[in-house]
């Protein structure tokens, strides 16, 4: 492929509106262009990468018996009314009317559409299981589209759906998809973790996310590729390292998810679902007499602990929440933070919100900071399981400026139930006891759900089972954010290349170090001077030879200065660059391996073998 025939509009500088490095490099290297807020055009290079990702997916889904189809993006609102999501999905749903004033939507996902198709065609368990998927454009009216392809209004998604007559069949397909996803992301070269996740608005029971880990900006060795004349990072002057660190610091760590994983273990979960080891305390502690004490000006846990000279673990914090139409009191230990997702899931609520200060004062006669469980009537009290272990606790007295000491559950106040409601902290023990918990930022690239009968019951998608009974089909749902996967790859494979000039000056620049299986082309042939007849003859010879060996080759046949060509080549980020320069008449070329920065001069006859050896 000739570069002069392609649309690769590189930029000399990083775009000023980019906040994450993947967005900046996709724009600067000419992979994408923004058409409007949250909407991007995938230019030829990006499209080639996306096609390679799609082909990897198709190969792995073929292995598990998933069949590709293509559903419409313009969907009738009637199906979404059947499932109940037309009213509940929220403002992110694109709603529109046709000329007959009928309601339609632009599909953000296709559970209703697929279920409608299946219910109209399948009536017997004998035709199940059915496993279908599509790779198509989706739409979501994001209030604040940002971070390039990571949070857009139009995006490319692979969404799969499976239908089953029994739970064992659903469980088997769910596991098949989990393994297929792991293979896909491994082939993409990603550092990722499958984690326990919240099903959220999708509904259903079991749910697992696949998160691409985004690196911090501290470990320079991860980010740097050194030229062949720099032996180690220690050789780079501190002033240059400081400049590099400053450059790294300009870019946000991408990823809206915080994941929790066990260092030294297998446990991993979204922070919304993460838990830690819980060991009930069986030691006997004498219950002391309840005592009301003045705590003037002490409202926070830290202030109360300091005033009473006690450990914060000896205190109980009282929160008040609206859960749908019910007011609920929540008890937590010390400075533990309430995990609202855990609370929502436990209550089965569709809506929760913290009560206001005014509401609390009107209901209980005290402000937050002096609120406590003793004497509360006609209100539901739920506590985190750690609260049950606290003996002789300090709690608010429901009078501003006062607290109780030596409060004990069962004697001084009642709790309806103790459940896991807290957000875990880094350094706690994994729930399986294998390793300590660490936090990391990450990008959600895949999500699988066991939806059960969430949609099939609502839409009357029934079959006759082996006994002739009418039952709702069981359903699974499996998604991969294909376009955001491109951004996740760049977040992990962006590199800063450091070179030392003949004058002993150190220079650095951003580049993309694409995994070999995903790079838009395998090899970049760069003739320095297109007016040099010997160079162009050798370029044509090498292109033909490399293509004959199965390589995908991009030839920079533009009449540009060498510096422009090399800068663009570095930005584009193909795994191998072959430079055809002044020694072309002798059959000598220069080979540069992007992943390592290694550069060698070789004879043209050694090119194929050299590339194979150096690329391993």
From Swiss-Prot:
Coiled-coil residue windows: none
Stored SUPFAM superfamilies: Class II aaRS ABD-related, Class II aaRS and biotin synthetases, YbaK/ProRS associated domain
Keyword Lipid biosynthesis in record: no
The name this protein goes by in its record: Proline--tRNA ligase
Keyword Ligase applies: yes
GO biological process, one term: prolyl-tRNA aminoacylation
The protein's assembly and partners: Homodimer.
Gene3D superfamilies: Anticodon-binding domain, Bira Bifunctional Protein, Domain 2, YbaK/aminoacyl-tRNA synthetase-associated domain
Keywords recorded for this protein, A-Z: Aminoacyl-tRNA synthetase, ATP-binding, Cytoplasm, Ligase, Nucleotide-binding, Protein biosynthesis
GO CC terms of this entry: cytosol
Record's function text: Catalyzes the attachment of proline to tRNA(Pro) in a two-step reaction: proline is first activated by ATP to form Pro-AMP and then transferred to the acceptor end of tRNA(Pro). As ProRS can inadvertently accommodate and process non-cognate amino acids such as alanine and cysteine, to avoid such errors it has two additional distinct editing activities against alanine. One activity is designated as 'pretransfer' editing and involves the tRNA(Pro)-independent hydrolysis of activated Ala-AMP.
Domain notes: Consists of three domains: the N-terminal catalytic domain, the editing domain and the C-terminal anticodon-binding domain.
Compartmental location: Cytoplasm
Source superkingdom: Bacteria
InterPro entries noted in UniProt: aa-tRNA-synt_IIb, aa-tRNA-synth_II, aa-tRNA-synth_II/BPL/LPL, Anticodon-bd, Anticodon-bd_dom_sf, Pro-tRNA-ligase_IIa, Pro-tRNA-synth_IIa_bac-type, Pro-tRNA-Synthase_IIa_type1
Catalytic activity field: tRNA(Pro) + L-proline + ATP = L-prolyl-tRNA(Pro) + AMP + diphosphate
EC number: 6.1.1.15
GO molecular function: aminoacyl-tRNA deacylase activity; ATP binding; catalytic activity, acting on a protein; proline-tRNA ligase activity; transferase activity
Gene from which the chain derives: proS
Family the entry assigns: Belongs to the class-II aminoacyl-tRNA synthetase family. ProS type 1 subfamily.
Primary location group: cytoplasm
Species: Lactococcus lactis subsp. cremoris (strain MG1363)
């Amino acid at each position: 492929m000739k570069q002069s025939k392609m649309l690769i509009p590189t930029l000399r500088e990083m775009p000023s509106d980019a906040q994450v490095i993947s967005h900046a490099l996709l724009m600067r290297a000419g992979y994408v262009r923004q058409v409007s807020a949250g909407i991007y055009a995938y230019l030829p290079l990006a499209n080639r990468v996306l096609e390679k990702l799609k082909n990897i997916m198709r190969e792995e889904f073929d292995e598990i018996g998933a069949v590709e189809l293509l559903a419409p993006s313009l969907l009738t609102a009637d199906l979404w009314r059947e499932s109940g999501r037309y009213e509940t999905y929220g403002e992110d749903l694109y709603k529109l009317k046709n000329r007959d004033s009928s309601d339609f939507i632009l599909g953000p996902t296709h559970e209703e559409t697929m279920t409608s198709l299946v219910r109209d065609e399948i009536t017997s368990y004998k035709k199940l299981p059915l496993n279908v998927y599509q790779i198509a454009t989706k739409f979501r009216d994001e209030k604040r589209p940002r971070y390039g392809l990571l949070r857009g209004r139009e995006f490319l998604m692979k969404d799969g759906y499976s239908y089953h007559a029994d739970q064992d069949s659903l469980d088997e397909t769910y596991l098949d998809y989990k393994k297929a996803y792991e293979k896909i992301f491994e082939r993409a070269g990603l550092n990722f973790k499958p984690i326990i996740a919240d099903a959220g608005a999708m509904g259903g029971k079991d749910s697992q996310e696949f998160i691409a880990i985004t690196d911090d900006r501290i470990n320079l060795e991860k980010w740097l590729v050194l030229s062949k004349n720099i032996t180690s990072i220690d050789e780079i002057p501190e002033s240059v390292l400081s400049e590099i660190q400053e450059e790294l610091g300009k870019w946000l760590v991408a990823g809206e998810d915080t994941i929790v994983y066990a260092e030294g273990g297998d446990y991993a979960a979204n922070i919304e679902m993460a838990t830690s080891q819980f060991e009930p305390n069986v030691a006997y502690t004498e219950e002391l007499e309840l005592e009301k004490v003045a705590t003037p000006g002490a409202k926070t846990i830290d202030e109360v602990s300091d005033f009473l000279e006690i450990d914060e673990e000896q205190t109980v914090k009282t929160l008040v929440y609206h859960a749908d139409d019910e007011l609920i009191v929540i008890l937590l230990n010390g400075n533990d933070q309430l995990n609202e997702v855990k609370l929502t899931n436990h209550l089965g609520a569709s809506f929760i919100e913290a009560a206001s200060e005014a509401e609390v004062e009107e209901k209980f006669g005290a402000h937050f900071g002096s609120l406590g469980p003793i004497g509360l009537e006609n209100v539901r009290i739920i506590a985190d399981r750690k609260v049950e272990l606290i003996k002789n606790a300090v709690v608010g007295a429901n009078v501003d400026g006062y607290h109780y000491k030596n409060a004990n559950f069962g004697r001084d106040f009642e709790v309806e139930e103790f459940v896991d409601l807290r957000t875990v902290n880094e350094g706690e023990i994994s729930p399986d006891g294998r390793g300590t918990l660490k936090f990391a930022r990450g990008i959600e690239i895949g999500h699988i759900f066991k939806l059960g009968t969430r949609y099939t019951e609502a839409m009357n998608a029934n079959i006759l089972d082996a006994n002739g009974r009418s039952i709702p089909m069981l359903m699974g749902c499996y998604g991969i954010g294909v376009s955001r996967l491109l951004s996740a790859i760049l977040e992990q494979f962006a590199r800063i290349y450091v070179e030392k000039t003949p004058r002993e000056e150190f220079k650095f620049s951003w580049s993309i170090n694409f995994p070999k299986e995903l790079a838009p082309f395998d090899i970049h042939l760069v003739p320095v001077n297109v007016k040099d007849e010997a160079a162009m003859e050798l370029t044509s010879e090498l292109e033909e030879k490399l293509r004959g060996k199965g390589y995908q080759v991009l030839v920079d046949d533009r009449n540009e200065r060498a510096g422009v060509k090399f800068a663009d080549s570095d930005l584009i980020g193909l795994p191998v660059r072959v430079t055809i320069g002044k020694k072309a008449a002798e059959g000598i070329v220069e080979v540069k391996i992007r992943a390592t920065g290694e550069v060698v001069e070789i004879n043209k006859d050694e090119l194929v073998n050299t590339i194979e050896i150096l690329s391993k």
